[in-house]
């Protein structure tokens, strides 16, 4: 009898183990696409997604490595990556990625590498699929995983702008503070991912994986620990819409880098073909702007590709008004270093002056109009601006630094105390290849990069004059009200959003410093 009982108990035990194993290792439900998740409540689920396979619309990683090569390594390194790409395309996917990593990162100083947070987020955000983003928004905890992109390239974009909780990318090997251009072993990367997924399964018990049909990224680990796996096909990506700027979880206000165009293979080819012509065009434009009178230089510059559009012509509207003893104060938003110069072009005046907070010595020497460096002392700076106004017209950019995106930084109120009449000037700039601004690069090259662009375009709009705050202001509030009103007027004219961010905020985000340029 005892033998029968023991056999019966053994059978029950084996059956129990079989059922338990089936429960623990039950095969997940495989789905063709994540769109069905939009109808589900995912607030208690952990979503694990493949960055390049399921989040980004483009399948090519070349543009992102080209951005690293150009912005962190320079023109020669980026050209080397470009000429090697035909060979890279013949390699296996994994080997091709290794070569691009080597060319882009070898010898780059780890401490000075800021492209991952200052340059790449703009281009990654422009490549995010709206449909996939809508799914991620519904999830509880979100984990982004990449088998091809280094951690330093994707972490800033995913954490800072898409609010992804955990980012698992490939770590880079570093020796003596410099990148070797080699990623850590894939096995170590898989172990990190394995431990992470196991932990999430134990904590929540609800894990959903989203990856691509065209990659084997952690397919075994996905199938072991995810209750559901959704596969994204290339055809799905082609039908995706791009994530609109208005839906960014965090607005992209600041970004750095010289390239204004996404360096796809064809765009990079055009960029390097334009190079020899760009040097000649920049030299000619610089000569014309410095040496030829405005009446002749403006049409010549327009013929060379530099465009200037002026609306609400201030010169024509002031012809019938009596002259003033003091010059006119023009207050404009700051887009590039050449803002005061283009305002002078629009006014058809060459004796106009401007003040700067921090300008390289080379730029001061090359400037065709007089520039005066401010000391950041309110009293002495105010006196300097009043003196300049007695000599003629003055252009100021109270933001203190440039901003590329449709936002206005806080306006310093100092300009409101030096003139009774203030003319707000709304400025917009469009470039094709190169930005004429930088936060972490050589600021002396800012005008050069602007002139290297094929069709740099300025639009100047003179707004209605406003009264300053030179009268008695005992509580000190009027100057801030005037500054905010001028900022608001320019923002409305340009359809830009006004912010309270400052120069210091920008440089801390992009360059890790306070934005003061040392005299060279």
Swiss-Prot record:
Pathway: Phospholipid metabolism; CDP-diacylglycerol biosynthesis; CDP-diacylglycerol from sn-glycerol 3-phosphate: step 1/3
Sequence motif: HXXXXD motif, positions: 334-339
Tissue expression notes: Widely expressed at low level. Expressed at higher level in seedlings and leaves.
Alphabetical list of InterPro entries matching this protein: HAD_RAM2/GPAT1-8, Plipid/glycerol_acylTrfase
Catalytic activity: sn-glycerol 3-phosphate + an acyl-CoA = a 1-acyl-sn-glycero-3-phosphate + CoA
EC main group: transferase
Swiss-Prot/TrEMBL GO biological process terms: CDP-diacylglycerol biosynthetic process
SMART domains hit by this protein: PlsC
Transmembrane regions listed in the UniProt entry: 5-20, 64-84, 88-108, 264-284, 286-306
Alphabetical list of Pfam families matching this protein: Acyltransferase (PF01553), HAD_RAM2_N (PF23270)
Top-level taxon of the source organism: Eukaryota
Keyword Transferase: yes
Membrane topology, as annotated: Multi-pass membrane protein
UniProt keywords, alphabetically: Acyltransferase, Lipid biosynthesis, Lipid metabolism, Membrane, Phospholipid biosynthesis, Phospholipid metabolism, Transferase, Transmembrane, Transmembrane helix
Compartments reported by the entry: Membrane
EC number: 2.3.1.15
Domain remarks: The HXXXXD motif is essential for acyltransferase activity and may constitute the binding site for the phosphate moiety of the glycerol-3-phosphate.
Family named by the database record: Belongs to the GPAT/DAPAT family.
Functional description taken from the UniProt entry: Esterifies acyl-group from acyl-ACP to the sn-1 position of glycerol-3-phosphate, an essential step in glycerolipid biosynthesis.
Name the UniProt record assigns to this protein: Probable glycerol-3-phosphate acyltransferase 3
Native species: Arabidopsis thaliana (Mouse-ear cress)
Gene (name only): GPAT3
């Amino acid at each position: 009898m005892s033998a029968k009982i023991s056999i019966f108990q053994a059978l029950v035990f084996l059956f129990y183990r079989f059922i338990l194993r089936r429960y623990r290792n039950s095969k997940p439900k495989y789905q063709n696409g994540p769109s069905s998740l939009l109808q589900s409540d995912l607030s208690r689920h952990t979503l694990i997604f493949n960055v390049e396979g399921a989040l980004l619309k483009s399948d090519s990683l070349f543009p992102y490595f080209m951005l690293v090569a150009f912005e962190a390594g320079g023109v020669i390194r980026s050209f080397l990556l470009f000429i090697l790409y035909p060979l890279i395309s013949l390699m296996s996917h994994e080997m091709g990625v290794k070569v691009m990593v080597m060319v882009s990162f070898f010898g780059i100083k780890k401490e000075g590498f800021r492209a991952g947070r200052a340059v790449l987020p703009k281009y990654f955000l422009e490549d995010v699929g709206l449909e996939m983003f809508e799914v991620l928004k519904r999830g509880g905890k979100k984990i982004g995983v990449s088998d091809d992109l280094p951690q330093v390239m994707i972490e800033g974009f995913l954490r800072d702008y898409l609010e992804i909780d955990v980012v698992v990318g490939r770590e880079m090997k570093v020796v003596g503070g410099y990148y070797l251009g080699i990623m850590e072993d894939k096995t170590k990367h898989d172990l990190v991912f394995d431990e992470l997924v196991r932990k999430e399964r134990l904590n929540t018990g609800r894990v959903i994986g989203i990856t691509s049909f065209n990659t084997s990224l952690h397919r075994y680990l996905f199938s072991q620990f995810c209750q559901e796996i959704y596969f994204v096909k290339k055809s799905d990506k082609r039908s995706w819409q791009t994530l609109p700027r208005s839906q960014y979880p965090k607005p992209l206000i600041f970004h750095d880098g010289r390239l204004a165009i996404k360096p796809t293979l064809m765009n990079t080819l055009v960029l390097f073909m334009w190079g020899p012509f760009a040097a000649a065009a920049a030299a000619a434009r610089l000569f014309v702007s410095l040496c030829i009178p405005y009446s002749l230089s403006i049409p010549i510059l327009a013929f060379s590709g530099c465009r200037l559009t002026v609306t609400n012509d201030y010169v024509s509207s002031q012809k019938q008004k009596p002259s003033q003893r003091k010059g006119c104060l023009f207050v404009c938003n700051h887009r590039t270093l050449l803002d005061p110069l283009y305002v002078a072009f629009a006014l058809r005046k060459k004796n106009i002056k401007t003040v700067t907070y921090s300008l390289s010595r080379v730029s001061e020497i090359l400037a065709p109009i007089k520039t005066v460096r401010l000391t950041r002392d309110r009293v002495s700076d105010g006196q300097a601006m009043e003196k300049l106004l007695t000599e003629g017209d003055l252009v100021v950019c109270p933001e203190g630094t440039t901003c590329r995106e449709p936002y206005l930084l806080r306006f310093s109120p100092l300009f409101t105390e030096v003139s009774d009449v203030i003319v707000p000037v709304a400025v917009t700039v469009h470039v094709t290849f190169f930005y004429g601004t930088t936060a972490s690069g050589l600021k002396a090259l800012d005008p050069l990069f602007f002139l290297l662009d094929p069709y740099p375009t300025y639009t100047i709009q003179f707004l209605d004059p406003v009264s300053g705050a030179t009268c008695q202001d005992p509580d000190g509030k009027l100057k801030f009200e005037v500054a905010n009103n001028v900022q608001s007027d320019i923002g409305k004219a340009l359809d830009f959003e006004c912010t309270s961010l400052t120069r210091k905020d920008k440089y801390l985000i992009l360059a890790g410093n306070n934005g003061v340029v040392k005299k060279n």
